[in-house]
Amino acid sequence: VDSTPLKSLAPFPVGVAVQAAQLSDPSWTSLAASHFTQLTAEWEMKMEYVVHADGSFRFDRADAIAAFARDRGMRLFGHTLVWYANEPEAFARLDETRQSFAGALANYVTAMVGRYRGLASGWDVINEPIKDDGSGPRDSLWSRKLGQVGHFQVAFEAARAADPQSVLFTNDYHLESKPAKLASYMRLIEQLLSAGVPLGGIGCQTHLDADLPAGAISRTLKALAGFGLPIHLSELDVSVVGGGLLADRAGAERRQEALYGEAMDAFASLPQRQQFAFT
């Protein structure tokens, strides 16, 4: 097995996701420190873990992940501040006034981003905002209370104030395989930038099936790079399970290998200033 560190093969940050329980596994920690330069919290920085029912916050596991990154000279990436799938009870029961809800959301974002100021190189501020069918932005607790652009404004402005140096992202998936979703995502980005939302980067979750047509990743990254912002190729995995691919397992695995290579080549072809991280 080739043991060459992955981080030595790329001129840009190469990242890995982690859950706090893995930090007690010496084989995992050795592998992570040897091969990667960026660490993303897979779960313990999400609202469903951080926010208690009474509205208080817990940072124990996020702190452990941050300490691991700091002690090994790795960048920390915060994932994720606002996600439609996380609607904590403490937020859902707030009164209906916009001011009350905006204040609570800004307080949460400020607490999270401020706690890791100077260590977190970036944050997924709002995660997966577009409907799967590409028909437009998702309906969520946040958009219902504050409006589609409004909830971006509250969250991004609070994050920017809490850490002016951190790169602030929105992030979504299936952009390579669903042209309508990519188009809707790009329209939202245009709207946010026009409204003055301090969006600093674009996340492209890269959950792929091995039968994805060749060239789709490259076309997607090229389209997103047209905004001139840093690109985070995030959450990369290539499944060989869907679409009857297991009928030809060997062929699916060859295609899987090819897609990983295409993703790396497509990211490497971006202007250097737009290569935020490959994870």
Question: Can you say where each PLM-predicted feature lies in the sequence?
Answer:
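Aromatic-residue hotspot detector
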Residues: 59, 156, 272-274
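Short, functionally important structural connectors and interaction interfaces within domains
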Residues: 24, 122, 189-191
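Non-catalytic scaffold segments within catalytic domains of secreted glycoside hydrolases
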Residues: 3-20, 29, 67-70, 88-114, ...
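Substrate-binding cleft and catalytic face of glycoside hydrolase catalytic domains
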Residues: 34-52, 61-175, 238-243
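N-terminal pre-domain/capping segments
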Residues: 2-63, 78
